[in-house]
Amino acid sequence: SEGNSGELNPGDVQWMTAGRGIIHCEEPHEDFLKTGGRTHGFQIWVNLPAEHKMMAPRYQEVPASESPTVEENGVSARIIAGECMGVSSSIDTKIPITLIHVKMEKGSRLIQKIDSALNGMIYVFGGSIIIENKISVKKHPMAFGLGAKQNIVDGELALLSEGDEIKIHSTSESEFLILAGPELNEPIERYGPFVMNTKEEIHQAFLDYQNGTLAK
């Protein structure tokens, strides 16, 4: 909605805060459309508390070359938000958020501190890991298993129990995301691309979009 544009390359991060409204579009690069191939990425939505929902929209972009990264004992962690092994992200998330992209060699271990006030999860998208905490595991859209010290494999999501750290052991070369954030304890209404606190706010967002005032 501001006429800005940019390119995201492998490992780059774009943190968009929609705030009071922004019109945006993400699509494959024209060269990729011509040559074809495979790519993957993650689009993760963070629900801001009511006090921040109408803040000014903004983008924070961090190229891969500037992304805080730490490597230690077979573990490589890229800190998109939050902190890992003493290294912190520079992204302003407004509320406490942890988002870490981790790669582990087979047999390596990681202990990640998580604020006990946050809800945490791990999504594995390569290899397998053992999480030495009590967790519930989403193996497919309609099934959860519950237990401790479970093997989590490619495509599975582990919801973490209460505690202030996660103990992870990689049983193969693995790649996953560690995510955590606060429980807002606020009402939530969602419709289409809009996430607000009340139906009235959703209705107003649609009116603003139709009137051309959403991103003004």
Language-model features, listed with the residues they occupy:
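Jelly-roll (double-stranded beta-helix
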Residues: 1-216
